[in-house]
């Protein structure tokens, strides 16, 4: 029960920080054009976000972290960093589809930090449910930000916001990995 209480103590940040940053930038940008796409498109994008989150979490947390930490008994911090580097590098591939190099690098840094956090959540809970929920929520708000406004361009302040949020995620994930629940590992 102590592990569950400790997990819930931390989960609120993972569930809210990046989505709130995305929604805040979305609102500050001032263009609410959901009607341009229609509800079918919006629901389709939300479903895609959840399927992508599920697939990535099954691979990175459900397979890699599970095998490294619980199978090969690699220290959680080392396993989390290795998997998070791979997760961040994978997001660099977005430069081939829609992103500029600056945005792809920013997204990779954010993905690394979020991955540390998601890895800690998975190690503590031994469940992918929270990881998929957090990842899906981040994906949904990110896609909403990208699709809602074709004029949306990240300026210096947006880069600083995303880097600050990434830093908070990173620190929070490291704290979870080093928390008293992890001492037995």
Predicted regions and their residues:
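Specific transmembrane helices
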Residues: 1-53, 143-185
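Residue-level recognition of pore/gate-forming positions within transmembrane alpha-helices
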Residues: 18-19, 84-87, 136-139
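The feature captures the transmembrane alpha-helix scaffold of multi-pass secondary transporters
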Residues: 42, 46-47, 77-81, 100-104, ...
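Small-polar-interrupted transmembrane alpha-helices in polytopic inner-membrane proteins
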Residues: 49, 76-92
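Residue-level hotspots within the lipid-embedded alpha helices of multi-pass solute transporters
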Residues: 49-55, 88, 107-112
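Membrane-interface helix/loop boundary segments of multi-pass membrane proteins
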Residues: 55-82, 120-127
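Transmembrane alpha-helical segments that form the membrane-embedded catalytic/substrate-channel core
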Residues: 88-95, 117, 170
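Functionally important transmembrane alpha-helices
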Residues: 103-160
């Amino acid at each position: 029960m102590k592990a569950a209480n400790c997990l819930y103590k931390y989960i609120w940040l993972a569930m809210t920080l990046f989505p709130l940053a995305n929604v805040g930038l979305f609102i500050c940008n001032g263009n609410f054009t959901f009607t341009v796409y229609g509800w079918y498109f919006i629901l389709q994008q939300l479903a895609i976000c959840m399927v992508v989150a599920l697939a990535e979490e099954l691979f990175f947390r459900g397979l890699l972290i599970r095998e490294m930490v619980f199978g090969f008994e690699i220290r959680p911090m080392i396993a989390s960093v290795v998997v998070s580097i791979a997760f961040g590098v994978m997001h660099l591939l977005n430069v081939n589809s829609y992103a500029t190099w600056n945005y792809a690098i920013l997204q990779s840094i954010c993905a690394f930090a979020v991955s540390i956090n998601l890895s800690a959540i998975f190690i503590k809970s031994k469940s992918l449910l929270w990881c998929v929920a957090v990842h899906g929520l981040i994906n949904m708000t990110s896609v909403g930000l990208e699709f809602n406004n074709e004029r949306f361009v990240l300026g210096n302040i947006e880069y600083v916001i995303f880097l600050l949020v990434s830093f908070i995620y990173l620190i929070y994930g490291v704290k979870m990995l080093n928390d008293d629940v992890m001492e037995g590992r």
